[in-house]
Structures are given as structure tokens and as C-alpha cells.
């Protein structure tokens, strides 16, 4: 019996030895209304926003817009500003009130810059002011109503 420890395991030196061959892989994707818009990464949320950014946003003006799309399972969507301009990113943590936004809902919101470059904006303190007519709305607790 030898008192020397066994040599440490060596990592594989060739891709084929670990099953990573250069083969084209395609992934089926479901159509998404959010595909044309770029989602910030990492997603800025109410929890991760700094106190100073929250204060600046709260003191800012209130804007009006329409919900372009919102995916509850993904936790984000976009608002089309009433005065034109590029769509504004919306995170689930910034939606106030009892209803999940749907396409066509009229909303009011304030804006906050998205770090680290602060070049883009996101909607915060989002409030649904008018539910889109003829659509079903869900509450955060799961109840469905027709508007």
C-alpha cells in the first residue's frame, strides 16, 4: 500500500472526449410578442433598484401610455408611450393595483433609467387607469373578470 495520494483528475483536453462536438443545434422557439424588443439583462426590479433611483423616479413626472404586451410568466412587458417614442420596458414588480396588465390597457407610469449605463428607461409605479374593453383581466390572485 502506497502512502502517496492519487494524482488529481485531469480535465479532458479534447471536445469529443466530453461529447461536445461541433454540431449545429437549433432550438425551436415559440412566437413571442416581446421578440422585437430587447429585455435588459439583468432584469432591474423594484428589489434591486437603489434607494436614490427610487426617489428620483418617484419625484419625476407621470406619463401616459398603453400596454403593448405583458407576459405574466416571464414577468415583463412593454408600454407604448402616448406621446410617441420607443416602447418602455415594464417589470412585473413595478405594476401597482390588483390586475395583471393586458394589451390595450391604458396606464400611467413614471420612468427610471436602467443601470449600468443608464441609456434606456423602464416604467415604474405603473397603474392601470382603464382596462382594455372586451378583454378578460386576471387579478394577481387568479380571479378572471371580463371588461
UniProtKB/Swiss-Prot annotation:
**Superkingdom as given in the UniProt entry:** Eukaryota
Give me the ranges of the annotated region Disordered. 1-52
Instruction: List locations, semicolon-separated.
Output: Cytoplasm; Cytoplasm, P-body; Cytoplasmic granule
Segments forming domain CSD:
62-129
- Is Thylakoid given among the entry's keywords? no
Where is this protein chiefly located?
cytoplasm
GO BP: intracellular signal transduction; regulation of mRNA stability
The effect annotated for residue 41 to D is:
Reduced affinity for single-stranded DNA. Abolishes location at cytoplasmic stress granules
Please describe the post-translational modifications of this protein: Dephosphorylated by calcineurin in a Ca(2+) dependent manner. Can be phosphorylated by DYRK2 (in vitro).
Give the record's GO CC terms: cytoplasm; cytoplasmic exosome (RNase complex); cytosol; P granule; P-body
Q: Which residues carry this modification: Phosphoserine?
A: 30, 32, 41, 52, 58, 146-147
Matching InterPro entries, A to Z? Ca-reg_mRNA-binding_domain, CSD, CSD_CS, CSP_DNA-bd, NA-bd_OB-fold
The name of this protein is Calcium-regulated heat-stable protein 1
Q: Which organism is it from?
A: Homo sapiens (Human)
Amino acid at each position: 500500500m502506497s502512502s502517496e495520494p492519487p494524482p488529481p483528475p485531469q480535465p479532458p483536453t479534447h471536445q469529443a472526449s466530453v461529447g461536445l462536438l461541433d454540431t449545429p443545434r437549433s432550438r425551436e422557439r415559440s412566437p413571442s410578442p416581446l421578440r422585437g424588443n430587447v429585455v435588459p439583462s439583468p432584469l432591474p426590479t423594484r428589489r434591486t433598484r437603489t434607494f436614490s433611483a427610487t426617489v428620483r423616479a418617484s419625484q419625476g413626472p407621470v406619463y401616459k401610455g398603453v400596454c403593448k404586451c405583458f407576459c405574466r410568466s416571464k414577468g415583463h412587458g412593454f408600454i407604448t408611450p402616448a406621446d410617441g417614442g420607443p416602447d418602455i420596458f415594464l417589470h412585473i414588480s413595478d405594476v401597482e393595483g390588483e390586475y395583471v396588465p393586458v394589451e390595450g390597457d391604458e396606464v400611467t407610469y413614471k420612468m427610471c433609467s436602467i443601470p449600468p449605463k443608464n441609456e434606456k428607461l423602464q416604467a415604474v409605479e405603473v397603474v392601470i387607469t382603464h382596462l382594455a374593453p372586451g378583454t378578460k383581466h386576471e387579478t394577481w390572485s387568479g380571479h378572471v373578470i371580463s371588461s
